Amino acid sequence: MKKIGQFIYSWGNGHYTRMMSLNEELPNFIKEYETHYASKDEIYQKLVARFPKQIVHMANAPTPIDGKYGPDVLLSMLNAFIPIRGQKPLISQVVNYLREERRLFDSQKFDLVINDGDMGPNILAKNRNIPSIFVTNQFKPRLWKSRFYFYPGVLFIAKQIAKATKIVVADSPPPYTICEYNLNFPEDIKHKVFYAGHFASGKKKRNSIKSNLEKLIDGHRFGYWMRTGNKSTNDITGKKYEESFSQIKSEKRIISHARNDPTIDVVKDEKGNTYSISDALDKRIDWIQIDVGFLSESEKETVLESCDYTVINGSHTVMGEIIGIHGKPIIGIPVYDEQTNQIQWAEE
């Protein structure tokens, strides 16, 4: 039986979402296989909740240091040389995490390695002559002038990605590539690049019984505001959204927070009064804003089909789903250069 190692970068949820979509397709290509998963933090916890613990492993790939809103650039750069907030210097982190992954490689004897965002396995697989696939939506992203100091890091990352046997772009082939401005592949590696399309499923995931939220929004026109990303990205996205609400006071909106926290679920009317979703439904409240911590698959499907437009930060996974599957117009309020590039491509 073939053994596959899947390594998932823990910065943001898109890497995990793509890999789970890939898992749904793998049986169409490989009949008998065993998969082991590796990540850390919140993604590790999701894997443990979803799969038997004996096939889920800790992989401490370094991640940026969170700031109040987005990664703290200064602290992340200083962390390359000194400990910051309990994180060892970046060089020590890299050495330790490669040592851990090396042990996993040697103990499991993988026949194939699939990585989404985690570049270390590319190096280990190449050194062991194990075929590897790197799933991505960026290689050498176009940086804006304010981010020139990231360029050496971008070149280093591109060099490690290039060590994969195959590079799978989770996007449509040119000229329909949303992440085009984040790729910029050199000629010498284009032979190993494959465009696989967006890892978004067109399967309808609707329950036969409507939830209270689905009943509450039935027949209304509204915009769907999606907060996505890790904690700091989610926070700054939410802050940017809130700055816009004063300009659209009478326009209905649903805000999904991508956090499994039911205390977030609140309905507001135009006077600012708040209600639970069930109370708002019972009292037939003329709502103006609905905040939801986490939408079920059925609720998300209903919201996307019913909304007039979506507001996003430029997350690649989300853009593929909204534009590719649902064909809804988007309004982009990006946080990072990567997201700005994708929003600009869509606008053009």
Task: For the regions a language model picked out, list residue spans one by one.
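A short, glycine/small-residue-rich beta-strand->loop->alpha-helix junction that serves as a flexible
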Residues: 7-20, 232-236
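Conserved nucleotide-sugar phosphate-binding/catalytic loop shared by glycosyltransferases and other
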Residues: 25-92, 284-286
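Glycosyltransferases and closely related glycan-assembly transferases
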Residues: 50, 102-113, 120-134, 327-328
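Conserved nucleotide-sugar donor-binding subdomain of glycosyltransferases
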Residues: 73-115, 119
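Alpha-helix C-terminal capping/helix-to-coil transition sites in glycosyltransferase folds
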Residues: 109, 163, 305-306
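A donor-sugar binding/catalytic signature common to diverse glycosyltransferases
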Residues: 113-116, 297-344
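Active-site-proximal region of nucleotide-activated glycan assembly enzymes
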Residues: 128-198
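Donor-nucleotide binding loops and adjacent catalytic segments primarily
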Residues: 201-309, 319, 340
